[in-house]
């Protein structure tokens, strides 16, 4: 692959399309302990937690003292703790001054101004080169989709992810290695935000060029949708066995998609809408944190869980990127917007509230899906993937479905596959 092509955005070995048994991993049986353990006892953690308690408790004088101290100690260009403190401090300031809406709007506008196809591509490439944070879910999803749609002459993938199609070059490569005639692939990708129109156009052109190189008949459709993914017109995007799908085997790919839906019944409605599409498979990849408003009713608990999750994320970036990396800064600025939303935004409208593997599994099961175990072949591909990166990464199997990516023994990403459950027997 040419180094200047977007098709190089996913350089992992494509998963084997052959079927195999499900693979076995160590099980994490007590997620509550792992997820809710306090972050390491650094000065940043202690001061931020105390400041959050002062803000939520109305102790204005103490909150102001702590904010002044945190401002002196923090820096968006310092070490992990200084960077993290800077972003959480800004969110606490926005909360205390009731300026969350304007702060989120300003951060979003700044992100749009700095986003281009080249900057998006460069950040994605570099992040995948140095960390499995994204590629882990890509490899798991690709392998599961390839196996679920094996033998189908016409494949339709509805990609609801926010990863700018970076997982599909290796999927195209894997299709090209299959024996017999290459199947026709239709990729429908959903993009959010007006600033992404040009990015989507560039991505589509490069994917079409790469598909021609691989000898894969390929159709690409970009759908632009701002706001809640649950409000998409799913039937028009790809309705399983209906005319909208043209009889294709349908796969729905959700990488960091579901937590973009406001928590509660909206997420249940989203899962139910996916079930009505009658797909062969739905892949769900989500970052792991228990930030549901119904479970994080008090601000202190929600703040501590947000701090725990982003401490792990920033720590992984610290050990993967140079301190002055532009790509690292871009990833951290995106995290800053998420932190602002979680700390200062309205929980009922938040698009950043992650869940646990158990809670996502419960939603999928309630919507009429059954877990689809990842095969030995996919497990082998994931194991090989982690060997490419520095020490500290591992994986384990959570109950009841999927597999975890762990950073320093802490679950950070969950990858899973689901199939429609058979209808209940008639009474």
Model-derived segments and their meaning:
Residues 1-427:
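Long, compositionally biased intrinsically disordered terminal regions
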